Amino acid sequence: MKTIEVDDQIYRYIASRTLHIGESASDILRRLLALPLDTEPTVALGHEANAEQTDEVSTDVLTMLLDNAQLAKEESAIARFMLILSALYRSQPDAFRHAADIKGRKRIYFAEDPQALLDNGKTTKPKPVPETPYWVITNTNTGRKRLIIEQLMQAMGYSADLIAEVCNKV
């Protein structure tokens, strides 16, 4: 296996073409370029192997996000918050769906339509999370945004170290 460097736009394009968790960049490119499949199967073999593979892939997606120049150049905490939420969804859509049930004392954080968020508070300023079916409240301070990310990642099963690293990027 060789390593190549690609710019952020190309990386995002490749990542956005992922069909399933565990699909490698090589598999995606082979599919996009209509090249023959690799002789080694890349399909998940079982539940245990699949869980390990999911952790590895989702950690890779987040690690790439943390190193991403786009995240670093974003001046707004809301923009960084949205990039992180989008990456979390792309890394584990099913886990994100289950974890999106988290809520604060007085309001829900995520919904599939903005009205549900507005029904829980007229000042929530719901915004769509890019590349997901979800909306999130944005009228919160940076500390609350970090708490939302932390609770979401805990519910998704991420390690405490990775959670802390991601939260520090908001």
UniProtKB/Swiss-Prot annotation:
The lineage of its organism: Bacteria, Pseudomonadati, Pseudomonadota, Gammaproteobacteria, Aeromonadales. InterPro entries: Arc_rbn_hlx_hlx, Ribbon_hlx_hlx, SeqA, SeqA_DNA-bd_C, SeqA_DNA-bd_C_sf, SeqA_N. This is Negative modulator of initiation of replication. It comes from the Bacteria. Negative regulator of replication initiation, which contributes to regulation of DNA replication and ensures that replication initiation occurs exactly once per chromosome per cell cycle. Binds to pairs of hemimethylated GATC sequences in the oriC region, thus preventing assembly of replication proteins and re-initiation at newly replicated origins. Repression is relieved when the region becomes fully methylated. It comes from Tolumonas auensis (strain DSM 9187 / NBRC 110442 / TA 4). Homodimer. Polymerizes to form helical filaments. Keywords: Cytoplasm, DNA replication inhibitor, DNA-binding. NCBIfam families: PRK11187.1. GO terms for biological process: negative regulation of DNA-templated DNA replication initiation; regulation of DNA-templated transcription. Gene3D superfamilies: Met repressor-like, Replication modulator SeqA, C-terminal DNA-binding domain. One of its GO terms (cellular component) is cytoplasm. Signal peptide: none annotated. GO terms for molecular function: DNA binding. It is found in: Cytoplasm. The gene is seqA. The keyword Cytoplasm applies.
